[in-house]
Every structure is written in C-alpha cells, then in structure tokens.
Design a protein with these regions (language model features):
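Catalytic domains of carbohydrate-active enzymes, especially glycoside hydrolases
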Residues: 1-14, 226-231, 284
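N-terminal substrate-binding region of glycoside hydrolase catalytic domains
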Residues: 3-31, 62-68
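Active-site region of glycoside hydrolase catalytic domains
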Residues: 22, 31, 35-390
Length: 390
C-alpha cells in the first residue's frame, strides 16, 4: 500500500470476530487484530476508514432469531458498534455503518444469491424481504447513534449504498428528466437511500409495493434518518433511460447482446454511471450539501501471470480510466465528490463468484500467497503521484 502511494484505506470488520456470539462478551483478541492493522496503516501515513458490517452476519444470531428477519438485529448491531468504537475510536475517526443493504437482504432473502444457497435463507413473501431491509436500515440508524456516543473524539459517520444509477440515453432535457424520475422509482434508491437521506420511503415506491411494504413502527423513520457526514456510493455500472410516451414518462433500455462487459456478467461498461450517480444523489435528492465518496469502483478481469511473471490487465486500466474521467467531470461541475476508493487493492473472495473472479490491482497466488502488482497497480500509482487521470 505504501508503494502504491495511497493515503486512505477502506476495510471491513467482522462482527463475529469481535463478538463471536453476536451479542454479549467481546473477544479482545479480535479487537487486538484490528488495532495492529490500524496501527500499521497509520505508521505508513494511511488513514483508516472502517466499515462495521459487510454482510457477515454472526451465525449465532441467525440461529437465535433469524438475524435480519428480526428487529433484534438492529439493537445487537448497535451494541456491536459501541463495542468496536469504544475500543478503536482512539485510532479510527472515519466510520461507515453498513455496506450495500440490498446485497444481504433482497439478494439473500429473495433470490438466494448472497451468500450462495444459504440454507433456510429465502423467505416466503416480498413483504418479509422488505422487512429485512427495514430492519437493516434501523441498524444503520442505531449504529450511527452508537458510533457518535462511543467515539472519544469527533468522528465522521457514513453509510455505503449501491444505488441504482439511471443514465439518460442522451443529455437532452427530456431524457435527463426521465432519468431523474426513474431514479426515484428504483427500489435501490426509493427503499434505501431515500429513507436514510430524507426520512421517508419514496411515495412512488410505496405505492408500487402496496401491501408488500414493510411494517414501519412509530419513530422508525426518525431513527433511520440520522445526520451523516458523507455518503458512500459503490459504482460499477448502471441502466440507460430515455423519455417515453407512457404513464411513467420513461423506459429502461435493454442492452444489446454484444454490449461490452468486463469478465463478470453484471458489469457492463457504463462510465457515465459514475457521473450520473453522483449528480442524482446531489441534485435529484436535493442533498448538494452532502459530501460523497466513491467507496467501491472496479471490475473483474481475466488476469493471468505471463511468462515474465507479469499481469498485464490493460482492460482493467481502460475501465478505471473511463470511470475516473467521469468522476472528474462531476467534480469539475461542482458536485461534492470528495474521495475515491478503488475495489480492490488485491484479489479477494467474491460472494457470488468465490475466487473465480479477480478484482484486485494486486494479483494473489492463492496457493503460495505471493502478491504480484498488476499493470493496473503501476498505472494507478502514477495517477496518485500526478494527482490526475493518466
């Protein structure tokens, strides 16, 4: 990391490493692991940004009450946040509560994808799926309160969202307006970032859900709508939208079969999604005051070590260069983008793909654990050194 030249590093903590039973006794050895990690980062001039939950629910709470199916999960998450921040708040001042709520609610309880084919995960109705999502939003809100209460000094609190980015097919006034309207109707947005940033679910989305909308108790929305110091956005791709002569006034466009994708089916290359995601949050939601960080952006590539011991991932460089240029456009137009985290520093375990897809700019030989900086590593280091897209 020091060789790469980064000054900020985002990582996630494992709830069950800190509190093995999900609630109750804290494992101080687990805390010590993160103390060593953070101390090493700081010794190298790297500021840590910690995400408290990145999908690894404690099995004990799954067995006890079904984890996110229960509102109890929210209060247990707050207790976990208190345990972490009270022990590490002297080292970490940048906190993120939860990463990508749809990924462990809708993608797990509705379609059995994350984690893949987890036993007894799928629930019987859409309403139950939305209830898991609502419970996670409550956890975010209670987690924000817990972080601020436990931190020994002033700190920054954020949430990380994988928003549904609606990209206008053209930048004509009618297509831009259509994309803005479509942004409201996406459940990624209307059901997640709307309550977090505005204190209410999108009326359009609630009308669409009808009886499948989650049960909302008195005070829930106030709890969810906590003051944030920034919003993290994970951006990989998006959807094209154009104006249409229908009830909605817009339509989502299917991509051609030959549309370029990276080495994973769901990442079709759409760099404009970077710009429009930032713009929609700032403009469409009326939150021009809220700093935005890109907390994930990157892609899988078919990385192979050549006979010179190198990994020449020029396709990843192409992808990153286009997305960073779109981010620069957002900054140049005055939108409050304040930082960028590349996904990822090194090859990792992907929830759907396991070790079969590589997202890192550092190649990991999983048998020997040897690390090989890829061509994209050297390119990104040059971007950092020159403080521009090269």
């Amino acid at each position: 990391m020091a060789k790469l030249g980064i000054k900020h590093y985002r990582f996630s903590m494992a709830w069950s490493r800190i509190i093995p039973d999900g609630r109750g006794k804290v494992n101080e050895e687990g805390v010590d692991f993160y103390k060593r990690l953070v101390d090493c980062l700081r010794d190298h001039g790297i500021t840590p940004h910690a995400t408290l939950f990145h999908w690894d629910s404690p099995q004990a709470l799954e067995d006890l009450y079904g984890s996110w199916r229960s509102r109890e999960m929210a209060s247990d998450f707050a207790d976990y946040a208190t345990a972490v921040v009270s022990r590490l708040g002297d080292r970490i001042t940048h906190w993120m509560t939860i990463n990508e709520i749809p990924s462990f609610t809708h993608m797990a309880y509705a379609v059995d994808k994350q984690p893949p084919k987890a036993p007894s995960t799928r629930v019987s109705s859409l309403k139950e799926v939305w209830q898991t999502c609502h419970n996670a939003l409550l956890a975010h809100g209670l987690g924000c309160q817990a972080i601020r209460a436990a931190s020994p000094s002033s700190c920054s609190v954020a949430m990380v969202a994988d928003i549904g980015v609606t990209v206008p097919l053209t930048e004509s006034a009618v297509d831009v307006a259509a994309a803005q309207q479509a942004f409201h109707t996406s459940w990624f947005n209307g059901g997640i970032i709307f309550p977090v940033l505005t204190g209410a679910y999108s009326p359009v989305m609630l009308e669409k859900l009808g009886a499948d909308a989650p049960a909302i108790q008195s005070g829930d929305l106030k709890t969810i709508h906590q003051p944030l110091d920034s919003l993290g956005i994970n951006n990989y791709t998006g959807n094209y939208i154009r104006a249409a002569d229908n009830k909605q006034g817009f339509e989502f466009l299917d991509l051609p079969k030959a549309y370029p994708r990276m080495y994973i089916p769901w990442i079709h290359i759409l760099p404009e999604s970077m710009y429009w995601g930032i713009r929609h949050v700032s403009e469409t939601l009326g939150r021009k005051d809220l700093p935005i960080f890109i907390t994930e952006n990157g892609c899988a590539a078919q990385d192979e070590v050549n006979d010179k011991g190198e990994v020449i991932d020029t396709d990843r460089i192409m992808y990153l260069r286009q997305y960073l240029k779109a981010a620069h456009r957002a900054i140049s137009e005055g939108y409050p983008l304040k930082g960028y985290f590349l996904w990822s520093f090194m090859d990792n375990f992907e929830w759907e793909s396991g070790y079969s897809r590589r997202f890192g700019i550092t190649y990991v030989d999983y048998k020997t654990q040897r690390r090989i900086p890829k061509a994209s590593f050297k390119w990104y280091a040059e971007c950092i050194q020159q403080n521009r897209v090269v």
